[in-house]
Amino acid sequence: RGQRGRTWQGATGLDLMASIVLLPERMRAVAQFTLAKAAALAVRDLVADVFRSEDLDVARIRIKGPNDILVDRHKLAGILIANEIKGEHVRSSIVGIGINVNSSTWEGVDATSLLLETRRGQDLHLLLSRLCMHMDHWWGLTGKDDAAIAAAYTDALWAKDRYTDFTLDGRRITARPLDVDDMGRLIIEEVGGEVAAYGLERLRFLM
């Protein structure tokens, strides 16, 4: 379970579900979304590894802000993060990661899995090892090169700079994602040129 009561549903023994505990040394609370970016990029890189091994197009793998991983328009992975804040700093962070690996059916969810994309089953232990490797890479950049993390995350955003449909406070709009701000809100530009940042409680993709 993550922030705002969000949960991940996965099939035991078929899908990869992992919790990674991080203990930042000097991360300020205002910069905590960098952790979410690092985790999303680690999962994106893991999925890209699998795609490359099967000669599939890695450009189909995108991040739907703040931290879902899509293949085309179908959800393949999600990340749930719970941070413990003490004063002005992040004391600890639990990063929950769920990846659809060997599942093939879901109820009420537009999803996909590595099995469906590659037409072959995947070894969960091997995937976990590679996930930790990629997480170690991006986590190692936090506080040292946050700009590189931000640039990679922005570049991987789903529908970036492309007009698509959203609902804003229940009202349908057409806008294009530009970036995310330090609070994890998606920055969009509406057709009329208005630029603003919104959180998930107000802004929803229409998939």
Residue ranges of model-derived segments:
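A secondary-structure boundary/capping signal
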Residues: 65-66, 97, 199
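Polybasic "coupling" helices that flank or enter modular domains
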Residues: 131, 139-167
